[in-house]
Amino acid sequence: LAAKNINLSHIDVGGGLGVCYNDEKPPHPEQYAKAIADKLEGRDITLIFEPGRAIMANAGILVTEVEFLKSNEEFNFAIVDAAMNDLIRPSLYSAWQAIIPVEHRDAPTKVYDIVGPICETGDFLGKKRELAIEAGDLLAIRSSGAYGFTMSSNYNSRPRVAEIMVDGADVHVIRKRETIEQLWQGESLLP
């Protein structure tokens, strides 16, 4: 670019860093920064980096309750109280999120598709997960911190979930669960 008299004052490399959702091997932030710094050495260029997803993804967990278990000839389903409106990434992008029981159950496992209660074929949070679970169990859907809440919606008139901050032994509600009344507050009936 310099040979064509194009002088850059800054470069925005975007996010760049991947997140280990399953078995991916993204570069460590230090490796990534060094690779970029080595290419820019000696140049008077401001580097802009947006690491939001790499910072937030593994900082968030969506906790959901198993409401029902059902099976057909081919599949076992765990119907949970969370849905695609709460975490759209698995449905929208086929994103893989680790799903683990909050409490370990010493029982035989089965392979389940974890699905929500919305009447859509795309309402799934995970497919083919080997779990030992029963109705009433809590599941943790890991790596839900990046874009979880910002991409959530009120689809099917479902209030958005609460956000809870856990800091050591301290627990803080940082965003309350929406209510049905809050969903209606901006609406009016025709005269």
Model-derived segments and spans:
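Catalytic palm subdomain of template-directed nucleic-acid polymerases
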Residues: 18-24
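Conserved N-terminal phosphate-binding loop of PLP-dependent enzymes in the Aspartate aminotransferase
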Residues: 28
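Short, hydrophobic/aliphatic alpha-helical segments
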Residues: 2-5, 134-136
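Charged (often Lys/Glu-rich) extended helix/loop segments that serve as interaction or gating elements
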Residues: 35, 44-191
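Alpha-helix-loop-beta-strand connector modules within alpha/beta enzyme cores
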Residues: 1-4, 32-43
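Glycine-rich beta-strand-to-loop/alpha-helix junction loops that act as flexible
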Residues: 11-18, 51-53
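Flexible, glycine/charged-enriched surface loops at secondary-structure junctions
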Residues: 3-10, 46-51
